[in-house]
């Protein structure tokens, strides 16, 4: 054993003891691999199943090295786990072993913190006006303002009283609008600036995928300098990056910017912008009516719709004229403070920039219209190149998740993050001081769980293949019988809202005489409270859609059955995924095998992973889609999932569920 391995093991033992755990082979293997990656400055992908304890497996070796490390997660839940539970529990023990102080911090984007300048502004604000019109929003604003004056608070949205989204927007700012602490009247008290200052000196900084993605794509430093980047929940990083750099243009945003222009610099330029905003609003309304009445018009747009192109162009021209005027004449909006001026300029610049990008629509981009909120979206077709150039050549990157492989192969996920694998690895061109994106080790440390003895994978062959009209009567009947056998205790996962609504209607009829509570996710519901209700009531059923497929952690008797309505292939009208599949087809490959199947495999692995969350868990995963056993691609899906014991015998499965339900009662 090398000296480094011995140091890592000693520190890991101390950390595990501090949380009352026990050493795990997979955790030790992962920790040593992370230590070697940091020493040799190469990249690492680690698939670490639930129960491995992967957070300690990357934190401990990073601290042993004395490296400044940035940990980026996809979910708020994991950020909180790291900062509120894991790090506070293990840092005192690690400080004793390493003989030095250890610091850690969490840092988020500016918009996640209250802006004191905006909250205390005496100027009228289009955001603030809305709050005066609705009494409930006014009360929310009062609560938020009172909280902001509490000594010692972080100003973080996640610590604030729960308020309407519009209230938060009226009391926070964006990166474009923020003038910076040095130029702000409240700079010394600025919550965002204080959080960033704390993060600058910390050994471990925890942030989110989105903020890291924005920094990478914009090539503009937002986060502290670091010696290594750890991507936890790495299976989501490509999607989070795509979402972070997706531009949005809405009537509401344009009208808001025009209203700000009228207030701060009334005149011909503002009048022209207002006229352009009104015309754009009318055009978007008309186009939305067309899309809602014509199904074929939905999905990806190959070009800018003719009815929208001229209105978008006029918005861009009017907005550009105002920003140029503001730049040329710093006093154009009167005597108000620089921060107010920056907010106005930032909001208008954002509209101008987005409109300009849409007008330059190219082959490497995807444009679509979303009718629910009347929004034009513009996204990159791929983000792997920019991730490779701006992330993977700079520092060692440790990418980890419970689901990184598709059919036991890392390549699909590796390519999505930007790593060079296979034939692509031979064409890498890097500078002497850069890290090779092809120099990546791939490791699967397994899971401490005995899946074959802890769980059953039920794959009924008799069910019809799913169609476009939601779950069939046969699927709903099968689901009801399984829930009956389990006495509730079920997480039912659906790939569409139509499926959720159909299941809710059916189950409330067939289970009406049973002591089973049905909890159904509604559009806009926060996931946390739903899961909390489900976990507390052992006889409940939680029915939900895609947001429940990942991150739900309910060990014990409250969840002995996870039912999945269908293989979660991307919808044909999903713009970005369909565009990526088409690109693969046009290049002579297979959009289904290269895009659709890997996406479905990762989601299915995440969904099935909701069942076994501890060594004591027992239960059944039911995939109510016969294609998993009747289609050739089913083997790829099965090899991407936890190795549960497999059967298509419904009688055996229902009897197993009855025994588990009875055991939980005893």
Regions found by a protein language model. Give the residues of each.
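Conserved RecA-like P-loop NTPase helicase motor core
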Residues: 448, 460-470, 522-629
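Conserved helicase motor "Helicase C" RecA-like lobe of SF1/SF2 P-loop NTPases
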Residues: 495-522
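Conserved pre-motif I regulatory segment
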Residues: 2-45
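Signature of the SF2 helicase/ATPase Hel1-core->accessory helical subdomain module
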Residues: 64, 77-80, 84-88, 176-177, ...
């Amino acid at each position: 054993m090398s000296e480094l391995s011995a140091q890592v093991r000693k520190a890991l033992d101390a950390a595990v003891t501090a949380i009352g755990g026990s050493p795990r082979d997979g955790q030790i293997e992962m920790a040593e691999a992370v230590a070697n990656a940091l020493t040799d400055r190469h990249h690492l992908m680690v698939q670490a199943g639930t129960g491995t304890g992967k957070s300690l497996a990357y934190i401990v070796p990073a601290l042993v090295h004395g490296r400044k490390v940035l940990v980026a997660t996809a979910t708020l839940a994991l950020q909180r786990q790291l900062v509120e539970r894991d790090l506070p529990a293990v840092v005192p023990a690690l400080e004793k072993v390493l003989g030095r102080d250890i610091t850690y911090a969490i840092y988020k984007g500016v918009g996640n913190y209250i802006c004191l300048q905006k909250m205390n502004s005496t100027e009228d604000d289009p955001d603030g006006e809305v709050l005066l019109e609705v009494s409930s929003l006014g009360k929310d604003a009062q609560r938020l303002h009172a909280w902001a004056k509490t000594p010692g608070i972080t100003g973080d949205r996640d610590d604030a009283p729960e308020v309407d989204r519009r209230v938060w927007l009226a009391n926070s700012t964006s990166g474009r609008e923020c003038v910076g602490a040095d130029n702000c009247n409240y700079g010394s008290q600025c919550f965002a600036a204080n959080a960033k200052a704390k993060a600058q000196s910390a050994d471990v900084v925890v942030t989110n995928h989105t903020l890291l993605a924005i920094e990478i794509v914009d090539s503009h430093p937002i986060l502290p300098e670091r010696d290594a980047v750890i991507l936890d929940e790495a299976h989501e990083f490509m999607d989070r990056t795509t979402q972070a750099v997706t531009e949005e243009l809405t009537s509401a945003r344009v009208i808001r910017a025009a209203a700000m222009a009228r207030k701060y610099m009334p005149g011909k330029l503002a009048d022209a912008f207002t006229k352009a905003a009104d015309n754009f609003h009318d055009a978007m309304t008309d186009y939305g009516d067309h899309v809602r009445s014509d199904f074929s018009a939905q999905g990806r747009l190959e070009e800018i719709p003719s009815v929208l192109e001229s209105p978008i162009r006029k918005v861009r021209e009017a907005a550009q004229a105002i920003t140029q005027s503001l730049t040329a004449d710093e006093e154009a909006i009167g005597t108000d403070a620089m921060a107010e001026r920056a907010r106005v300029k930032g909001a208008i610049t954002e509209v101008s920039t987005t409109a300009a990008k849409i007008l330059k629509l190219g082959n490497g981009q995807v444009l679509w219209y979303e009718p629910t909120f009347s929004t034009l979206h513009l996204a990159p077709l791929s983000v792997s190149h920019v991730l490779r150039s701006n992330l993977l050549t700079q520092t060692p990157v440790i990418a980890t998740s419970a689901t990184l492989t598709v059919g036991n192969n890392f390549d699909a996920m590796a390519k999505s993050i930007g790593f060079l694998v296979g034939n692509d690895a031979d064409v890498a061109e890097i500078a002497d001081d850069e890290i090779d994106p092809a120099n990546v080790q791939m490791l699967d440390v397994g899971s401490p769980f005995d899946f074959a003895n802890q769980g059953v994978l039920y794959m009924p062959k008799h069910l019809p293949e799913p169609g476009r009209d939601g779950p069939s009567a046969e699927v709903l009947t099968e689901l009801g019988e399984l829930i009956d056998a389990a006495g509730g205790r079920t997480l039912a996962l659906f790939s569409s809202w139509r499926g959720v609504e159909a299941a809710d209607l059916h189950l409330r009829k067939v289970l009406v005489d049973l002591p089973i509570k049905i909890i159904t996710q509604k559009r806009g519901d926060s996931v946390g409270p739903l899961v909390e209700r489900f976990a507390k009531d052992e006889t409940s059923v939680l029915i939900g859609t895609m947001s429940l497929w990942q991150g739900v952690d309910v060990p014990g008797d409250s969840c002995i059955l996870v039912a999945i309505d269908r293989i979660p292939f991307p919808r044909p009208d999903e713009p970005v995924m369909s565009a990526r599949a088409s690109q693969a087809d046009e290049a002579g490959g297979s959009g289904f095998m290269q895009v659709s199947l890997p996406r479905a495999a990762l989601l299915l692995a995440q969904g099935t992973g909701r069942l076994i969350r501890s060594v004591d868990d027992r239960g059944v995963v039911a995939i109510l889609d016969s294609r998993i056993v009747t289609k050739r691609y089913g083997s790829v899906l099965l090899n991407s999932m936890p190795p549960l014991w497999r059967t298509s015998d419904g009688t055996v499965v229902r009897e197993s569920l009855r025994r588990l339900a009875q055991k939980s009662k005893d």
